[in-house]
Amino acid sequence: MSVESFTPTALEFTPGAAHKVKTLVSEEGNDRLKLRVFVTGGGCSGFQYGFTFDEDVAEDDTIVEREGVALVVDPMSFQYLAGAEVDYQEGLEGSRFVIKNPNATTTCGCGSSFSI
């Protein structure tokens, strides 16, 4: 497992998202937790984003660290997320992690589904 530094065009983990991850990890009392972002088939546009907390990191995972917390992406998902921004937003619709993905040609109105 290696931690690599990426330019903002590779995968951006915003300060807002990192702060929220740090808060949630602190609430759980388990500093081994990392935010895992993944892409699966499904949703109304063909692919959908998923978020989970994970203690484990595979050897070929990509890890992006900010503010002492980590975002983890598996190699299959990374090919769809290269150049994307992972952020955390609060609004009238509620609070959630969101992905701004320049690779997506169409997105669903909910923002969790996309196509390439």
Curated annotation (Swiss-Prot):
Q: How is the cofactor bound?
A: Binds 1 iron-sulfur cluster per subunit.
Residues annotated for iron-sulfur cluster binding in this entry: C44, C108, C110
UniProt-listed Gene3D superfamilies: HesB-like domain
- Enumerate the cofactors the protein uses: iron-sulfur cluster
Lineage top rank: taxon: Bacteria
In its UniProt record, a GO molecular function of this protein is: 2 iron, 2 sulfur cluster binding
Task: Please provide the Gene Ontology terms (biological process) for this protein.
Answer: iron-sulfur cluster assembly
Under InterPro entries, the record lists: FeS_biogenesis, FeS_cluster_insertion, FeS_cluster_insertion_CS, FeS_cluster_insertion_RrpA, HesB-like_dom_sf
Q: Does the keyword Metal-binding apply?
A: yes
The alphabetized UniProt keywords are:
Iron, Iron-sulfur, Metal-binding
Q: Could you confirm whether the keyword Metal-binding appears in this record? A: yes
An example Gene Ontology CC term for this record? cytosol
What's this protein's function? Answer: Required for insertion of 4Fe-4S clusters for at least IspG.
Q: Which HAMAP family match?
A: Fe_S_insert_ErpA
Q: Subunit structure, briefly?
A: Homodimer.
Q: PANTHER family annotated for this entry?
A: IRON-SULFUR CLUSTER ASSEMBLY 2 HOMOLOG, MITOCHONDRIAL
According to its UniProt record, which protein family does this protein belong to? Belongs to the HesB/IscA family.
Name this polypeptide is given:
Iron-sulfur cluster insertion protein ErpA
Q: Which organism's genome codes for this protein? A: Pseudomonas entomophila (strain L48)
